[in-house]
Amino acid sequence: MCQRIGGTVMDYTKSVEKWGVFEFYSEGTTAGNPFLERSITALFESDSERKTVNGFYDGNGIYKVRFMPSFEEEYHFTVCGNFSDRKYEGTFSVTPPSENNHGCVKVHNKYHFQYSDGTPYYPVGTTCYVWNLQSDDLIAQTLETLRNSPFNKIRFCVFPKSYCYNSREPRSYPYEGTPVDGSAITEDNVWGYGPDSKGNNWDFERFNPKHFQHIEYCIGELQKLGIEADIILFHPYDRWGFSTMTAECNELYLKYTAARFSAFRNVWWSFANEYDLIKNKSIEDWERYAQIIVESDPYDHLRSIHNGNQFYDHTKSWITHCSIQRSPEGTSEWRKSYGKPIVIDEMLYEGNIQYAWGNISPQELVRRFWEALCRGGYGGHGETYIDDKAIWWSHGGELKGDSPERIAFMRKILEEAPDGGLRPKNMEWDEICVVPEDENLADETGYHLFYYGISRPGFRYYHIDDNNIYTVDIIDSWNMTVENVGSFKGRFRIDLPTREYLAVRIKKAGDEIE
């Protein structure tokens, strides 16, 4: 229930679960430009943590601060700033996390991930660039599709997108103002509309809170489904001028976005989609923007920057994992080069559009997922089947392809492997293989996963060691079958069905793989 203190409406969350979102809000001044000239900051303290958090102006005279507590304790907070001539204090309690709340995803075992509570997290992502800026009905359909999909991460943008099959106007814009008239845009002329298109009239120092409120709704709905929100902060596909704002406006945007979104446990920061195609931003700019997010996000969410033609220097300390656009055959080498988790977020898309990046077969996309996995990394899904209403890669809606159920099968195989992720192991020259990243688990379980891709061997010889008995499964990654073919010792031959997309799983007999 709202409180009124000296004529000012104020309220805050009295109880929140661990890794949930606490929120304080209060009326404040509307004089001048509150987005630019007003501040609200809170100090949160418990027995085990102390954090200072920046808040934001949410429009209509309301200021907010959000906080994600990491301990089941009593917290005290103090709120101050020039949004008001008052200082506010209060306490709230933090309860145990609910069943599906595992906290934030963090890097684990150098090349892999886990949640805050130690639960393993294996990214199986998809891309829907502006699903969040579609109609209510289409958003609801996307969420229902995701509910029944194998995907536990989704990449999407804050800014709308102008591109092939993306000529319609978004549901909202991030700033106050008016857009270029898009009524005459077609698939034939959409490329003629760029960030300098005449007719745009924006105030880049005044945000549209409703745009951000809606994205927060989408983040929250993803959280309910256990899906990570990989938020793309900048991209080059723009007819409104959002990609060519001044550095000062970019910095204001980053601080505002971090203040609004950071308290959601499922947020990841993707600084750009195809950073190198945004020609007006230098490496020095990207480094400065990265530091703004690092300083503005008190929870240290995962951070990456996605490439077009040229990789970013992923050795930079602010980059937590590599977000890559390439075919996955280089995964093992990227692990060596960067010493970080490898997530190949774009490996081309299953579909039938005219462009080569969007018309590979489902068999090829599934092969790429397995190649990424069996080279020690993680793949990303996308789908571009022609549809007058919605194409998954950008708008969401329904999945039409044949790869998702095979990706779900691969995810099951991955989750059955020993915890802690898998690393590449050199075996024969013409095969790829992964074993547990943890050397003790590798020795204890003897787990090996081989993948043969487009090769069609009729048999293979294997030799793990001479002392242990190993059980062998033949996995058909396309037909989604697992066949146990017995137990073996020493050097042994396994007859295979002379089909593409086969994997072979070997582990010590009698061991329960956990």
Label the predicted regions.
Residues G7-S48, V53-F56, T91-P97, D430-C433:
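Non-catalytic, glycine-rich low-complexity segments
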Residues D11-Y12, N33-P34, N352, L365-G486, ...:
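Aromatic- and carboxylate-lined catalytic core of secreted/periplasmic carbohydrate-active enzymes
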Residues V16-V21, K489-R491, R499:
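Solvent-exposed, conformationally flexible loop/turn segments
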Residues L43, E49-H112, D117:
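Extended acidic/polar, glycine-enriched regions
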Residues L43-F56, I474-F492:
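Solvent-exposed beta-strand/loop surfaces of large extracellular or lumenal domains
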Residues E99-E329:
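Active-site mouth of glycoside hydrolases
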Residues S243, K279-E284, I353-P362, H395-G396:
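Short, flexible/disordered intra-domain loops and linkers
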Residues D300, K316-K389:
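Catalytic-core region of carbohydrate-active enzymes that cleave or remodel glycosidic bonds
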